[in-house]
Amino acid sequence: MDKVILVLLMSLGASSQPLTDTPRLFSMAVSRVQHLHLLAQRLFADFESSLQTDEQRQLNKKFLPFCNSDSIISPNDKHETQRSSVLKLLSISYRLIESWDFPSLSLSGGLSPKLSDLKTGILLLIKASQDGADMFSESTTLQLGPYENYYQNLGGEEPLKRTYELLTCFKKDMHKVETYLTVAKCRLSPEANCTL
């Protein structure tokens, strides 16, 4: 982790030198988010299989949670995703990952360090893509509610429902980030077909 932060600080400090290994950074970021998405799917499947009755499973499947990250403005469909700029997709991905800084602490699987590494990689890609533009200016900063309060209040007294809500939101957000990073990476290769 210290190496990642050192690399980040060195690259941010060397603004006169562009990052030339962007395709490799994209490959690493896509690989990491794919791993996180698979991990989210596994955690969700393990949770569902731990439920004792089919009625409990059906009850949970009827619940469609509102996630804290739903307040992050993102493309509504695959066409809008494909029309979005690489920088916009990276910015949305960063914000989605950032929205899990606190909630990931309550999920198993050692997610926090993995999310932190991915967030650092996405920040490097933003730096490489923006050519000095201030991506996180006050006009574009989204104010999300405090994550800890939102996710602590989910499900009230029902820990099963709370866990279900967290896992559902995490799986959904990792799928979004995987899609956005894959489309952004594809745009680097002119001969690639970037359809979803």
From Swiss-Prot:
<dbReference type="GO" id="GO:0046427">
    <property type="term" value="P:positive regulation of receptor signaling pathway via JAK-STAT"/>
</dbReference>
<comment type="function">
    <text>Growth hormone plays an important role in growth control and is involved in the regulation of several anabolic processes. Implicated as an osmoregulatory substance important for seawater adaptation.</text>
</comment>
<feature type="binding site">
    <location>
        <position position="178"/>
    </location>
    <ligand>
        <name>Zn(2+)</name>
    </ligand>
</feature>
<dbReference type="GO" id="GO:0048513">
    <property type="term" value="P:animal organ development"/>
</dbReference>
<dbReference type="GO" id="GO:0031667">
    <property type="term" value="P:response to nutrient levels"/>
</dbReference>
<dbReference type="GO" id="GO:0070186">
    <property type="term" value="F:growth hormone activity"/>
</dbReference>
<keyword id="KW-0732">Signal</keyword>
<keyword id="KW-0862">Zinc</keyword>
<dbReference type="GO" id="GO:0046872">
    <property type="term" value="F:metal ion binding"/>
</dbReference>
<feature type="signal peptide">
    <location>
        <begin position="1"/>
        <end position="16"/>
    </location>
</feature>
<keyword id="KW-0873">Pyrrolidone carboxylic acid</keyword>
<dbReference type="InterPro" id="IPR001400">
    <property type="entry name" value="Somatotropin/Prolactin"/>
</dbReference>
<dbReference type="Pfam" id="PF00103">
    <property type="entry name" value="Hormone_1"/>
</dbReference>
<dbReference type="InterPro" id="IPR009079">
    <property type="entry name" value="4_helix_cytokine-like_core"/>
</dbReference>
<keyword id="KW-0479">Metal-binding</keyword>
<dbReference type="InterPro" id="IPR018116">
    <property type="entry name" value="Somatotropin_CS"/>
</dbReference>
<feature type="modified residue" description="Pyrrolidone carboxylic acid">
    <location>
        <position position="17"/>
    </location>
</feature>
<keyword id="KW-1015">Disulfide bond</keyword>
<feature type="binding site">
    <location>
        <position position="35"/>
    </location>
    <ligand>
        <name>Zn(2+)</name>
    </ligand>
</feature>
<keyword id="KW-0964">Secreted</keyword>
<dbReference type="GO" id="GO:0005131">
    <property type="term" value="F:growth hormone receptor binding"/>
</dbReference>
<comment type="similarity">
    <text>Belongs to the somatotropin/prolactin family.</text>
</comment>
<protein>
    <recommendedName>
        <fullName>Somatotropin</fullName>
    </recommendedName>
</protein>
<dbReference type="InterPro" id="IPR034975">
    <property type="entry name" value="Somatotropin"/>
</dbReference>
<keyword id="KW-0372">Hormone</keyword>
<feature type="disulfide bond">
    <location>
        <begin position="67"/>
        <end position="169"/>
    </location>
</feature>
<feature type="disulfide bond">
    <location>
        <begin position="186"/>
        <end position="194"/>
    </location>
</feature>
<dbReference type="GO" id="GO:0005615">
    <property type="term" value="C:extracellular space"/>
</dbReference>
<dbReference type="GO" id="GO:0045927">
    <property type="term" value="P:positive regulation of growth"/>
</dbReference>
<dbReference type="GO" id="GO:0060396">
    <property type="term" value="P:growth hormone receptor signaling pathway"/>
</dbReference>
